[in-house]
Amino acid sequence: METVGRLCQTPIQEHRPIMAFNRNALQIAAISWLISLLEPNCSPAAQAKIWEDLSGEKALAQVQRLVDFGPRPSGSEAIENSRRYIEDQLRRSGWQVTRQAFTDDTPRGKVQFVNLIAQFSGQGKSAPLFLLCSHYDTKTFDAIKFVGANDGGSSTGLLLELARVIGQHPNLAAKVELVFFDGEEAYDHFSETDGLYGSRYFAKHLGGDRQFRGGIVFDMVGDRSLDVTLPADSPSEMARGIFAAAEALKLRNYFTYLDREMIDDHSPLNAIGIPTIDVIDFDYPWWHTAGDTIDKISAQSLQIVGSVALYYLSEVALKR
């Protein structure tokens, strides 16, 4: 692993000092002066690789904090508590957060939903941005305690860690927008009016001046037995880019194609012309059961997905 902010390895010509007794001091001073001149001109290849800054352990700790709030269905006190926590973490990492609140009809009556939209402090609005998204709600169950460690928790914890890392690289952060969707889960069955409440609302109310070059939706990315399956409806160029990023990091065996399309928060975004890929591991035995608990989540899995995403962002999607 390369050292953060390592210096360019540019040869430095040695000069013999006139006074021998001052030789060491003069050498140190000369080297320090040359380094100060060379540092700003270091090539990007010589800088620390952003994906090496990500910590799966820190992402897992974020998942734990979310799970500690208990079940977090839309409209509940617990989701409001988790919402405040997410906002606080984002602001600590240098992001400005806006609440997009709305009320929608559901099979259980009217429910208030709140999307969280984060842009980096001082971010301009002229260039097209890249979306990084996760839903942070958990499915409503009456008969079981569903804390959604993987389904809702893992992707949100990872996105908070991505926010921390990207926030340390302002030039990259200026090209990214983070969205935490409320209401991804359907109350009965996914349909045009049930499920994906937050992403449908976000897509419908995008202003004409808002331009996005693409997006990634993270969902269920913490399974200890990781097998990320990109849905069949994934934008082909983005899928190739994700696979290439995984290959470059020698993590390709964790990524494959799903043999069918997937209904998820990427669907409304693709429908309005924002190419968005769903990074999801749907092969999860505890999906929508009381067994979706923190012990099923792995820091290594979060590390893998986050590293590939950062490589894809910095070396493929936002290279220029």
Set out the residue ranges of the language-model regions.
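N-terminal capping segment at the start of a domain
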Residues: P44-S82, S93, D223, P285-T293
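Solvent-exposed loop/turn segments at secondary-structure junctions
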Residues: R72-S74, T103-P107, G124-K125, Y136-T140, ...
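A non-catalytic alpha/beta surface segment that caps or lines the substrate-entry region
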Residues: R65-K125
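Extracytoplasmic/secreted proteins, especially bacterial periplasmic and envelope-associated proteins
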Residues: K58-R65, N81, Y85-R92, V97, ...
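Active-site-adjacent substrate-binding region
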Residues: T103-D105, G214, D223-R320
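Short, low-complexity intrinsically disordered segments enriched in A/P/G/S/L with frequent Arg
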Residues: G5-P11, N24-A25, A29
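Bacterial N-terminal signal peptides
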Residues: A29-E39
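Acidic/histidine-rich catalytic neighborhood of metal-dependent amide-processing enzymes
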Residues: A143-A245, L249-N253, L258-E261, H266
